[in-house]
Amino acid sequence: MPSTMNYEQARFNMIEQQIRPWEVLDNQVLSLLAVVKREDFVPLAHKSLAFVDMEIPLPPQADPSQCMLAPKIEARILQDLNVQKHEKVLEIGTGSGYMAALLGHRAQQVISLEIEPTLAQSARHNLQKAGVYNVEVLQLDGSALLAPGAAEKAGVQGPFDAIVLSGSVAEVPTQLLALLKVGGRLSAIVGDEPMMRATLVTRTGEQAFGSTEAWDTVAPRLLHFPVPSTFSF
């Protein structure tokens, strides 16, 4: 296992060789990546891969979608959202808790939803160990929020300044847009393999939304989010 010194060198290399070349140039984001110890959120079996440009599987691995996204993806999402200190954020797909920790350092409050009980418990432990106390991890299927009134019943109290989907969906879930404040942003990786689009939707008015598709990537599906029907003849 690498020494502490090697971890710091690996972290520096990750930022300089992976993150910056991917047009992540926000100094606040780069500084945060240098401070939050990614290796502390990586499962022990994969600790040596903490700074590698790849998705890292998370236990219990019942589904391949349970993983940490590649560092450059997390960094680019963080830059796109531009979360401010006074803002309230919802994340769907806690995983290891690393992205929630990054968001917690930027926001006033973060609510993060994780469908897998073991991961939710592990993420809480990781966040506490990292000294991140403004993140609440709820063991909840994020797709359940798509039903009318489901968010309030589940204790997910909006509206939110930012919503992050830490995984991909076939299309932007319009039901989640209702949880945004005016001026709020939703970040999602949208589409199908082999090419998906990082999509940022901004609520510009009570009934008005704007959308940008800034970059291409691929990410595992969030579980149970709807897939449009396709017909074959």
Label for each model-derived stretch:
Residues 191, 195-233:
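Core SAM-dependent methyltransferase catalytic element
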